[in-house]
């Protein structure tokens, strides 16, 4: 069994190690090591197309993670007061949202937004004052942020609800006994207890949004995120520059995931 586990881990991580190794290749060929160099990292960071795509990815990831953290936390707290069959139904919907393949979410979001835009654009043209050009709703950063927020909300709900379930309910009861209002109890008791989980949900949401290609491919419109740029570049061949981008993204993602895990562990110790 141990040998099987080792083989599985090698199968998963050897390709990642190869990408990291060849990102330091001095030559242009991605499959032939010709010395050690960090020049591809410099070229990557000086490439304006990469920087524009990186900026878009950071904006989308931060905004989506922030919205998902706020709305997901609100939903998790609200679900605490629901019991019985309705609670089971909501739980099922949340887990289904996490399990749905990204391609399904991308196609469904694309169809939904196109339908809404087709209905609203003529209405805006009629209602907009004469002499001014009415705005035209189209695919872009807004649609991408909306799609990622809807997908990531379920993830935040699961993380925050797990922390809420592990909270010491006597603290909330003590706050009520001291005549604290529900809002004061949430602000001074509940929120500090679940904040590590909220922050962990934010970091995980940021990571998933930053790395996402499938949903972004459908709803980004003319905008280019870093995963879309990498996909377009790979179609022309793998280069050390692509390896450098992959290595940097991998490093940032691992750092965020480790930080999120530490926050969850810290929150678990505090709730006890």
Where are these predicted regions, by residue range?
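Hydrophobic alpha-helical transmembrane segments of multipass integral membrane proteins
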Residues: 55, 59-71, 75, 187, ...
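Membrane-embedded alpha-helices of multi-pass transport/permease systems
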Residues: 14-17, 21, 70-75, 107, ...
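Membrane-interfacial helix termini and adjacent extracytoplasmic/periplasmic loops
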Residues: 29-34, 38, 43, 86, ...
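Transmembrane-helix boundary motif in ABC transporter permease subunits
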Residues: 63-94, 107, 111-115, 169, ...
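C-terminal transmembrane helix and the adjacent membrane-cytosol boundary/short C-terminal tail
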Residues: 1-3, 83-86, 161-176, 186-188, ...
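Short membrane-interfacial helix/loop motifs at transmembrane-helix boundaries
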Residues: 14-48, 219-221, 272
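Transmembrane alpha-helices
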Residues: 3-4, 9-16, 96, 150, ...
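Interhelical loop and adjacent transmembrane-helix boundary motif
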Residues: 41-50, 210, 215-259
């Amino acid at each position: 069994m141990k040998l099987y586990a080792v083989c599985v881990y090698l199968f998963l991580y050897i390709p990642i190690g190869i990408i990291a190794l060849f990102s330091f290749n001095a030559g242009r060929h991605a499959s032939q090591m010709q010395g050690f160099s960090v020049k591809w990292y410099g070229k990557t960071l000086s490439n304006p197309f990469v920087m524009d795509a990186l900026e878009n990815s950071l904006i989308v990831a931060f905004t989506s993670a922030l919205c998902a953290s706020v709305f997901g936390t609100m939903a998790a707290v609200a679900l605490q007061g629901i019991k019985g069959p309705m609670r089971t139904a909501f739980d099922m919907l949340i887990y289904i949202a996490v399990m749905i393949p990204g391609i399904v979410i991308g196609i469904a979001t694309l169809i939904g937004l196109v339908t809404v835009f087709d209905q609203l654009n003529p209405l805006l043209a009629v209602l907009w004052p004469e002499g001014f050009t009415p705005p035209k709703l189209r695919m872009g950063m807004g649609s991408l942020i909306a799609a990622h927020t809807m997908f990531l909300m379920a993830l935040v709900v699961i993380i925050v609800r797990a922390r809420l379930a592990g909270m010491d309910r006597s603290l909330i009861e003590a706050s009520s006994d001291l005549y604290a209002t529900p809002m004061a109890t949430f602000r001074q008791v509940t929120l500090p207890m679940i904040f590590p989980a909220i922050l962990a949900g934010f970091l995980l949401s940021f990571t998933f949004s930053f790395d996402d290609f499938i949903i972004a491919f459908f709803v980004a419109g003319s905008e280019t995120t870093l995963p879309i740029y990498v996909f377009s570049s790979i179609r022309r061949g793998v280069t050390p520059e692509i390896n450098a981008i992959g290595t940097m993204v991998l490093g940032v993602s691992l750092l965020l995931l480790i930080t999120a895990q530490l926050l969850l562990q810290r929150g678990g110790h505090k709730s006890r």
